[in-house]
């Protein structure tokens, strides 16, 4: 299953036909500029650089910079991962005494510019991202169709805040399935899927297919290419211990958490889709809903309150004034649960998946996931668009952190 087939299960909010087209035909068609928190520049222990990269994934770029500078990649901080097939600008931090080494680094398709001194950057330490995106292979009529779709979505409160396909895997859509197996304590099943899932014409697929069919660890170690370093490390660990649990837990923690987060994201997407399917509003609070506070267009997901018969008019006014948004579940052991009709939808999803919130606590401690809430709608700030002859549609907008530009474009393009 590729990501298009996978996403076909999630309902569109807009009913108007999409413009079609194609994104990321070339890296310059997808430009991302990170907006840092002001506090990133407080302090003097770290040197802050602006990293421009083209066709590089963030982690690969960081590791290459560290290698060339002669420092540990763990000493390089960054606030968020950015698309690979794009031109992206983001901030990184390095220890102050490594400043000159990093300034001397020269790598194809990577540029580094010292900006300021500040503090060590960590994941999540950003406001959001600005985007400039070109959709190609559309004609001039795409402008009017875009206008109609945007008008319809504004009347419905915004764009559905689906997690994008990047969360699940573009060619091997398995991250959420591995996450579910981990939650069920099936480390062998999770490891076999991680190692053996194949398809999409990727290098190493033949070796993965052979392992999927035979489960032969020794053969896999002979056949798996060297760049599949996490897979090979897992296979070696299994050979040493005979335990798939120990083998899986040998993966770096950030990699393991990707799978749990992907499963949370899948359930959140299902919740939005189910709400659309049942005709329940995404921009209007129902009794039992949990809403998140909004300030300056930025959601504060740790500031929530429940909608009751008593406060519902007050909440609706807050939503009307863009000071609050209805939220959906990021299931976890301490997530604040909805009640009423929204609560019923949450319970139905858990029942269908044979899942309990306690399952998220039974995970090995570093992976245990408390969960939280996430707003159901996206309201892109400063959204502008236009048709450029012989090029296509050009879109510009800002999104808060953790929100996917591809989910905005999905409603307009109707491409997956």
Swiss-Prot record:
A biological-process GO annotation: tRNA pseudouridine synthesis
Segments forming domain TRUD: 158-379
Enzymatic reactions: uridine(13) in tRNA = pseudouridine(13) in tRNA
EC number, UniProt record: 5.4.99.27
Pfam family, one: TruD
Active-site residues from the entry: 83
Family: Belongs to the pseudouridine synthase TruD family.
NCBIfam families hit by this protein: tRNA_TruD_broad
Name by which UniProt lists this protein: Probable tRNA pseudouridine synthase D
Source organism of the structure: Thermococcus onnurineus (strain NA1)
Lineage: Archaea, Methanobacteriati, Methanobacteriota, Thermococci, Thermococcales
Gene: truD
């Amino acid at each position: 299953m590729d990501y298009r087939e996978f996403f076909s299960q999630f309902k569109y909010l807009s009913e108007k036909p999409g413009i079609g087209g194609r994104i990321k035909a070339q890296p310059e068609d997808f430009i991302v500029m990170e907006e840092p928190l002001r506090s990133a520049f407080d302090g003097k222990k770290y040197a802050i650089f602006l990293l421009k990269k083209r066709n590089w994934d963030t982690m690969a770029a960081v590791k290459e910079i560290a290698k060339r500078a002669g420092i540990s990649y763990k000493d390089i901080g960054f606030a968020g991962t950015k698309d690979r097939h794009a031109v992206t600008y983001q901030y990184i931090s390095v220890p102050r005494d490594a400043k000159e080494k990093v300034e001397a680094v020269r790598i194809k398709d990577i540029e580094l510019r010292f900006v300021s001194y500040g503090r060590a950057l960590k994941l999540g330490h950003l406001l959001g991202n600005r985007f400039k995106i070109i959709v190609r292979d559309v004609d001039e009529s795409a402008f009017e169709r875009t206008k109609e779709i945007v008008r319809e979505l504004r009347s419905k409160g915004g764009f559905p805040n689906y997690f994008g396909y990047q969360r699940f895997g573009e060619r091997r859509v398995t991250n959420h399935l591995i996450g579910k197996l981990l939650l069920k304590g099936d480390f062998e099943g999770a490891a076999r899927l991680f190692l053996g899932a194949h398809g999409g014409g990727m290098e190493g697929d033949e070796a993965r297919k052979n392992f999927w069919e035979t489960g032969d660890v020794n053969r896999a170690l002979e056949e798996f290419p060297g760049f599949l370093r996490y897979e090979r490390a897992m296979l070696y660990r299994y050979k040493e211990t005979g335990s798939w649990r120990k083998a899986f837990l040998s993966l770096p923690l950030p990699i393991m958490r990707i799978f749990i987060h992907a499963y949370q994201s899948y359930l959140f997407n299902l919740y939005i889709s189910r709400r659309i399917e049942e005709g329940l509003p995404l921009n209007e609070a129902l009794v039992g809903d949990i809403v998140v506070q909004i300030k300056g267009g930025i959601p504060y997901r740790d500031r929530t309150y429940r909608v009751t018969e008593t406060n519902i008019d007050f909440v609706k006014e807050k939503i009307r004034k863009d000071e609050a948004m209805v939220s959906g579940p990021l299931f976890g052991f301490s997530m604040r649960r909805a009640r009423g009709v929204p609560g019923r939808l949450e319970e139905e999803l858990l029942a269908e998946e044979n899942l309990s919130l306690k399952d998220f606590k039974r995970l090995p401690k570093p992976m245990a996931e408390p969960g939280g809430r996430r707003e159901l709608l996206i309201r892109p700030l400063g959204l502008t668009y236009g048709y450029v002859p012989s090029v296509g549609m050009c879109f510009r907008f800002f999104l808060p952190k953790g929100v996917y530009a591809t989910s905005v474009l999905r409603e307009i393009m109707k491409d997956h």
